[in-house]
Design a protein with these regions (language model features):
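Structural motif
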Residues: 22-25, 82, 158
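Flavin-binding catalytic cores
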Residues: 3, 7, 51, 114-126
């Protein structure tokens, strides 16, 4: 990412924390060099780390120290079997714990779709189990594979990212750069809006196409055993 920014004329400061933001400047500290700097800035935009809702933190043992919901492999709360969480609110440990400035794990759209699909299937299992009035605890089988698939544009350029899974260790890690990614991004946006308008947000042909190139959303225990 740093080399890509510099290639486009953007100066990047890594291992840096923000000390102060003024009307026309930003004061930072390079943690690795213990060097303080004052950078002129006509417009400053900060993207702070996500934190969970205060309401969640009030529930005993539901969240981590940042208020994110702790879940098991099936998107289910460790402490409350009737609570499932997907998306940005889920607690995911940092990928690299050795960084000087704490970093979080990326949560991309396809990963969140995978979490949602797994949660939906597992909730359905719980509902069916209750309707049958069975005394035993239901066995959840569906867990998200957390594969990463992303199309992004950088103005006149773009890239397609494919990581299987998104978080290391990975089996596949592919990045394709080029102007064609910009066209692909526009085409995908039109396709996505068409799905929403048509009310068919999870078409079978899309899942089949992705499956044929090795990208799936969820796996079950039966599939794990046969793999």
């Amino acid at each position: 990412m740093q080399s890509l920014l510099e290639k486009n004329g953007v100066v990047a400061y890594t291992n840096t924390k923000v000390d102060r933001v003024g009307n026309d400047y930003v004061k930072i500290t390079k943690v690795d060099e213990q060097k303080k700097m004052k950078i002129p800035s006509a417009m400053t935009m900060l993207i702070p780390p996500f934190r969970g809702q205060t309401l969640w933190s009030r529930v005993p043992h539901l969240t981590d120290k940042n208020g994110m919901v702790k879940v098991n492999d099936f998107q289910q709360s460790h402490e409350y079997s009737n609570i499932f969480a997907v998306g940005v609110c889920v607690s995911i440990p940092p990928i690299d714990k050795e960084t000087l400035v704490p970093l979080g794990a990326p949560k991309t759209g396809y990963v969140i779709e995978s979490q949602g699909t797994a949660a939906l299937k597992n909730i359905r299992t719980l509902i069916n189990h209750e309707e049958k009035q069975m005394d035993t605890q239901p066995e959840l089988r569906n867990r998200p594979l957390l594969n990463g698939l992303c199309i992004t544009d950088f103005g006149n350029d773009g890239a397609v990212f494919l990581t299987l899974p998104q978080y290391p260790p990975r089996k596949t890690d592919i990045t394709l750069h080029g102007k064609v990614a910009v066209t692909a991004k526009v085409a995908f946006e039109k396709y996505f809006l068409h799905k929403i308008r048509a009310g068919n947000t999870d078409p079978s042909y899309e899942n089949l196409m992705l499956h044929l190139i090795g990208i799936d959303r969820v796996t079950s225990k039966k599939e794990d055993a046969s793999a």
